[in-house]
């Protein structure tokens, strides 16, 4: 099995608490407002939003795939960290066993920084498509920036 992992840091003018609330805690109701052409809805299939929760994300016509299922592995509100994996859906292209994400939001200078780690686990003998991985990285950064812009435009969302 092959593994590719990448880290990225995205700076935000929002406070760490506000970005964590918007991008992690309220993402189910906020993301489709911030990216209406990309994400149609986020539905909780099981759980209360914390560890063990299963979410079904429905993408719109501008989305990368029709839908994916997320399994929440960890939600730490005190440390503003969130860990989840894609467990089902078209994002798990042939040869890809799983995708895991770790998000940690920290205070920084005049706002915050979102530290985002993504790990792709490939089945043995499968080819790695670097272009698709790069596109996924760009989409993640765009989502964070879209949530930031929405909250700035709608501070009382």
Swiss-Prot record:
InterPro entries membership: Bet_v_I/MLP, Bet_v_I_allergen, Plant_def-hormone_signal, START-like_dom_sf
Signal peptide: none
Induction: By cytokinin treatment.
Superkingdom in the source lineage: Eukaryota
Entry GO CC: cytoplasm; nucleus
Glycosylation-annotated residues: 79, 117
Keywords of this entry: Glycoprotein, Pathogenesis-related protein, Plant defense
Single GO molecular function: abscisic acid binding
Listed SMART domains: Bet_v_1
Pfam families, sorted: Bet_v_1 (PF00407)
Swiss-Prot/TrEMBL GO biological process terms: abscisic acid-activated signaling pathway; defense response
KW Glycoprotein (keyword) present: yes
Annotated coiled-coil segments of the chain: none
Family label: Belongs to the BetVI family.
Other observations noted: Related to intracellular pathogenesis-related (IPR) plant proteins and to other allergen families but has no allergenic properties.
Name of protein: Probable intracellular pathogenesis-related protein T1
Organism this protein belongs to: Catharanthus roseus
């Amino acid at each position: 099995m092959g593994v590719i992992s990448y880290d990225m840091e995205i700076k935000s003018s929002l406070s760490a608490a506000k970005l964590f609330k918007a991008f992690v805690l309220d993402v189910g109701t906020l993301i489709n407002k911030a990216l209406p052409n990309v994400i149609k809805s986020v539905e909780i299939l099981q759980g209360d939003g914390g560890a063990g929760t299963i979410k079904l994300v429905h993408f719109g016509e501008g989305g990368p795939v029709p839908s994916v299922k997320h399994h929440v592995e960890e939600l730490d509100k005190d440390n503003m960290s969130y860990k989840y994996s894609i467990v089902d859906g078209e994002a798990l292209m042939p040869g890809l066993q799983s995708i895991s994400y770790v998000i940690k939001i920290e205070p920084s200078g005049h706002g915050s920084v979102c530290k985002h780690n993504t790990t792709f686990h490939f089945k043995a003998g499968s080819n790695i498509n670097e272009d698709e991985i790069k596109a996924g990285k760009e989409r993640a950064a765009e989502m964070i920036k879209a949530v930031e812009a929405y909250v700035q435009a709608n501070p009382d969302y």
